[in-house]
């Protein structure tokens, strides 16, 4: 006997009524508003029960079988969010996912109530999955099946998109539809940013006592490693970026000696690499390293650092998800442009209470694709002139989009991320 994938809304209502999943609950007597726990998987206080609703949907929908499939929390979470976002009867009312004490999201039904979505028949068939049907959603499926909707682009379509990038003007346009260009024919070009085989390009700038002494652009599998001028371990991953000997640029011998001492403690170096939507860092030597997000011209030295790069494990230093959300808000005029420049202070504490130029070794790392995205947003909102932007990642091509299309592609990119 065949099985049918349960409908997300009747299934979710059933879970809410049962009240067995931690933090998943109705918020009003009319059963129109409910909350879902939304803790990030990388938080140190994350527990298995924080993600029970995502795993439950993965099991019910047949995407995950315990004991057979490998657990994949980001995919479970992304699929659950995408399933809810596709339902017009539901909307995100409040987003508290970044609340440090109780991260959650509040959804509400915009129809007359949950009576429009009867609970499923939760009897199990031989496979152990739910067998259910829903008249309301079945009618929607029939309506959609009669429309000419292109399927998602596969590998062949993606190849075509890379060989023939869209040539559209980057300008505000009332005539342009607010959707990614020809998504049925070619993949959203911005999704290259998350591709496992596409490496970001980084511009590395080194300062000794506030003086720029070095700049290099790096694009390499495995990311990069900031290493001292002495010989380093070539067996480690990441392209080594060798910081120059201070004697070539500093006239003060005493300062040069101190800088050289910092470089000698770098050991295997400071590793920086991308995995999915995150940039990760780890120090492989004895030299302590502090980091913070700042402007391209100067670090945010008037405040505390965002953190210290860990030695015994990797630490996240940048999340593309909030950056894209802030970029959309910037395009809409509701906030300033998001920051994307990483500053690292090596061998000394972060310059919180004094000028950053007093520090011996400061390194600035700019992900060039993020600079391109911000430049694209600025140009699209400030000018009607055509502009072509290179994302500065491997296998990328010059990209041109209208302002509306660009914003829609950014929103589409957010759907593929884990929050």
Curated annotation (Swiss-Prot):
**Region described as Disordered: spans on this chain:** 118-137
Region Interaction with HERC5, residue ranges: 198-358
Residues recorded with modification Phosphothreonine:
3, 75, 235, 251, 402
Q: What disulfide bonds does the UniProt entry report for this chain?
A: 265-287
What does its PTM field state?
A: Constitutively phosphorylated on many Ser/Thr residues. Activated following phosphorylation by TBK1 and IKBKE. Innate adapter proteins, such as MAVS, STING1 or TICAM1, are first activated by viral RNA, cytosolic DNA, and bacterial lipopolysaccharide (LPS), respectively, leading to activation of the kinases TBK1 and IKBKE. These kinases then phosphorylate the adapter proteins on the pLxIS motif, leading to recruitment of IRF3, thereby licensing IRF3 for phosphorylation by TBK1. Pyrophosphorylated by UAP1 following phosphorylation at Ser-384 by TBK1. Pyrophosphorylation promotes subsequent phosphorylation at Ser-394, leading to homodimerization of IRF3.
Q: Which residues does the record list as Diphosphoserine (modified residue)?
A: 384
Sites of N6-acetyllysine modification:
364
Cross-link position per record: Glycyl lysine isopeptide (Lys-Gly) (interchain with G-Cter in ISG15):
191, 358, 364
- UniProt entry keywords in alphabetical sequence: Acetylation, Activator, Antiviral defense, Cytoplasm, Disulfide bond, DNA-binding, Host-virus interaction, Immunity, Innate immunity, Isopeptide bond, Mitochondrion, Nucleus, Phosphoprotein, Transcription, Transcription regulation, Ubl conjugation
**Localization of this protein:** Cytoplasm; Nucleus; Mitochondrion
Say if the entry is tagged with keyword Signal.
Answer: no
Keyword Transcription regulation found: yes
Q: Which GO terms describe its cellular component?
A: mitochondrion; nucleus
UniProt subunit comment: Monomer. Homodimer; phosphorylation-induced. Interacts (when phosphorylated) with CREBBP. Interacts with MAVS (via phosphorylated pLxIS motif). Interacts with TICAM1 (via phosphorylated pLxIS motif). Interacts with STING1 (via phosphorylated pLxIS motif). Interacts with IKBKE and TBK1. Interacts with TICAM2. Interacts with RBCK1. Interacts with HERC5. Interacts with DDX3X; the interaction allows the phosphorylation and activation of IRF3 by IKBKE. Interacts with TRIM21 and ULK1, in the presence of TRIM21; this interaction leads to IRF3 degradation by autophagy. (Microbial infection) Interacts with Porcine epidemic diarrhea virus E protein; this interaction prevents IRF3 translocation to the nucleus and thereby prevents type I interferon production.
Q: What is this protein called?
A: Interferon regulatory factor 3
């Amino acid at each position: 006997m065949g099985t049918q994938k349960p409908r997300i809304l009747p299934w979710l209502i059933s879970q809410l009524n049962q009240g067995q999943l931690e933090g998943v609950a109705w918020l009003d007597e009319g059963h129109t508003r409910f909350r879902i726990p939304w803790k990030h998987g990388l938080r140190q206080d994350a527990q298995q029960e924080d993600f029970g609703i995502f795993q439950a949907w993965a099991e019910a929908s047949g995407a995950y079988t315990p004991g057979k499939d490998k657990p994949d929390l980001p995919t479970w979470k992304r699929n659950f969010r995408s399933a809810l976002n596709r339902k017009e009867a539901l909307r995100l009312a409040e987003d508290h996912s970044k609340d440090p004490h109780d991260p959650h999201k509040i959804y509400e039904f915009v129809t007359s109530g949950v009576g429009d979505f009867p609970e499923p028949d939760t009897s199990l068939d031989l496979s152990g999955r739910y067998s259910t049907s829903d008249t309301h959603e079945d009618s929607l499926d029939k309506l959609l099946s009669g429309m000419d909707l292109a399927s998602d682009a596969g590998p062949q379509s993606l190849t075509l998109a890379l060989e023939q990038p869209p040539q559209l003007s980057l300008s505000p346009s009332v005539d342009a539809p607010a959707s990614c260009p020809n998504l049925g024919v070619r993949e959203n070009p911005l999704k290259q940013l998350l591709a496992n085989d596409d490496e970001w390009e980084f511009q590395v700038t080194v300062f000794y006592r506030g003086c720029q002494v070095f700049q290099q652009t790096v694009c390499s599998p495995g990311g990069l490693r900031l290493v001292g001028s002495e010989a380093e371990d070539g067996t480690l991953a990441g392209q080594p970026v060798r910081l120059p000997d201070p004697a070539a640029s500093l006239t003060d011998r005493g300062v040069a000696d101190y800088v050289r001492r910092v470089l000698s403690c770098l050991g295997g170096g400071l590793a920086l690499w991308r995995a999915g939507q995150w940039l990760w860092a780890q120090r492989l030597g004895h030299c302590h390293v502090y980091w913070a997000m700042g402007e391209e011209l100067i670090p945010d030295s008037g405040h505390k650092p965002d953190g210290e790069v860990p030695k015994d494990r990797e630490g996240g230093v940048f999340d593309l998800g909030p950056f894209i959300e802030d970029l959309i808000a910037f395009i809409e005029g509701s906030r300033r442009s998001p920051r994307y420049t990483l500053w690292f202070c090596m061998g000394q504490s972060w310059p919180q209470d004094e000028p950053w130029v007093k520090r011996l070794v400061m390194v600035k790392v700019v992900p060039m694709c993020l600079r391109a995205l911000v430049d694209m947003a600025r140009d699209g909102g400030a000018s009607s002139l055509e502009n072509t932007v290179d994302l500065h990642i491997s296998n990328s091509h010059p990209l041109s989009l209208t302002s509306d299309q660009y914003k829609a592609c950014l929103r589409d990119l957010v759907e593929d991320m884990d929050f």
